[in-house]
């Protein structure tokens, strides 16, 4: 109905909310972060049979938010779970806190970030949600099999960035790369 479409369009203009994923990509930009203040973690769900992506950020030096030990895979101790981390740490645990971005395109509605345990590794995959003909991409790996809180290391070409609106940085992270893997100029 034309009246409903007009109302939705007017509401979008009034609120400034984007109407499509492509529009969303052009409304927001991406700003660099100090990646040494972040750790990407395969965090167990329930009894630990499956895992999800958590990203922890150290915002101040008041006390440590996480500790990393070992290698291949490294184990993460989420210290922030043991104190009120307000103003000290940030924790990003789902699509409200992070999404996939490639170049100028925010792919948060078209890809989900999923932790998958293989026989020899723990991988963070970008999996298409709407178009199964789109590629699944390996974004990060642990470097070996493991259970519990396992550190994920970004693959070459990927990095963390913060969502930006105009000159204002927002509390949303991008798992970012300049171009699609395998495309000309991509790492």
PLM regions: where:
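Extracellular/luminal recognition modules and glycoprotein regions
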Residues: 21-81, 117, 130-132, 144-187
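Acidic, glycine-rich flexible loop segments
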Residues: 119-141
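C-terminal segment of classical bacterial N-terminal signal peptides
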Residues: 7-20
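N-terminal chloroplast transit peptides
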Residues: 1-2
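Structured domain cores in non-transmembrane regions
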Residues: 57-123
């Amino acid at each position: 109905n034309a009246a409903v479409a007009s109302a939705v369009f007017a509401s979008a203009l009034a609120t400034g909310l984007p109407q499509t994923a492509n529009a969303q990509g052009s409304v927001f930009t991406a700003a660099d972060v100090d990646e040494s203040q972040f750790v990407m973690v395969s965090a167990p769900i329930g009894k630990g049979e499956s895992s999800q992506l958590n990203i922890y950020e150290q915002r101040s030096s008041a006390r440590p938010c996480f500790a990393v030990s070992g290698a291949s895979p490294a184990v993460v101790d989420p210290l922030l779970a043991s104190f009120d981390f307000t103003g000290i740490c940030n924790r990003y645990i789902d699509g409200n806190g992070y999404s996939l971005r490639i170049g100028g395109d925010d792919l948060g509605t078209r890809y989900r970030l999923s932790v998958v345990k293989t026989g020899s590794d723990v991988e963070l995959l970008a999996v298409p949600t709407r178009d199964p003909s789109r590629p699944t991409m390996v974004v990060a790996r642990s470097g070996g099999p493991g259970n519990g809180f396992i550190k994920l290391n970004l693959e070459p070409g990927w990095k963390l960035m913060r969502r930006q609106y105009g000159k204002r940085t927002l509390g949303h992270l991008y798992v970012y790369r300049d171009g699609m893997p395998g495309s000309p100029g991509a790492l």
